[in-house]
UniProtKB/Swiss-Prot annotation:
Pathway: Amino-acid biosynthesis; L-proline biosynthesis; L-glutamate 5-semialdehyde from L-glutamate: step 1/2. Catalyzes the transfer of a phosphate group to glutamate to form L-glutamate 5-phosphate. Substrate binds at residues 49, 136, 148. It is found in: Cytoplasm. It comes from Rippkaea orientalis (strain PCC 8801 / RF-1) (Cyanothece sp. (strain PCC 8801)). This is Glutamate 5-kinase. Residues 276-354 form the PUA domain. Disulfide bonds: none annotated. ATP binds at residues 8, 168-169, 211-217. One of its GO terms (cellular component) is cytosol.
Amino acid sequence: MKQTIVIKIGTSSLTQPESGKLALSTIAALVETLTQLRQLGHRIILVSSGAVGVGCSRLNLKERPKKMAMKQAIAAVGQGRLIRVYDDLFNTLGQPIAQVLLTRRELIERSCYVNASNTFESLLELGVIPIVNENDTVAIEELKFGDNDTLSALVASLIHADWLFLLTDVDRLYSADPRLVPDAKPITLVNSDEFAQLQVKAGDRGSQWGTGGMATKLAAARIATGAGVRTVITHGGKPSNLLKILQGEAIGTQFEPQTRNDSARKRWIAYGLLPTGKLYLDSGAIRAICHQGKSLLAAGIIKVEGQFEASEAVQLCDETGQEMARGIVNYNSLEIDKIKGHHSDEISQILGYGGAETVVHRDNLSVNG
């Protein structure tokens, strides 16, 4: 069966650990595997890190820079070199590619989100493999994805992918870092119920040249599986394993997807937008929005956290602060603070002007899986 597959490869797999130079044999093996998948009829998107690492190597820098402006400059140097290597290798196999550089802004603005989706769809229809990276050179700190694990999960949600492969420097998820804890236990399959209870010492440390660690991969897997995408963590040095996994072999760690039938708009609310505040809700409101498909009314709001404007996204939390849903609000934070706990027919009297009966309409609300 033809499937849509997103593959993310990190800096630790793309580069040699000591020098930061490109690991050309690994990249060549990856290119060969992805071309094989295309020839089998699958739709392929590659999310590739490495621009900053390659830039550092090209400029003979011994460590990754800390300052944002310097990282952006070095990314500009490295991205050109990286995409050229990919193009040369794919070209030898007759496989066309495209470079797609994204910032978080493209996913926050609804029109840009739709345009990005349409562009990916057109590229895939043409048989092209898009190679995606964050546009580090122009991204601002507040609107950065933070790591390409998150970016790959958001792209997988955007294009309704069937699979997301997170290629890393270990063969699967373990109960602790196997490089530090010799008796760490391997984890091969995680269903949605187990994922909610999963407790592993994942750490937050990436490689010298990259930004990701196992913690970011677990966060990405939560996003992707929540959007209905089966997710796999496996070794980036063995790209041929992708074919074996698709054929049913138990390699790496697989995270089973949740069953979701959300509209494209609700996926955008859940994964594209950045929440700018929180609303704490009572149990009745939680039940209404999560289990009865209703809108959020002011009466069910206990507390407002953060400053935000109308039409921005917020997290909808239970009384303990656990996020249960996300939604686009009809009022700003000051207005909601005034009307919280009151019935809808009291809103105009409290504010002195008329407004929506709902704080978040159900069409602008996405419940967590």
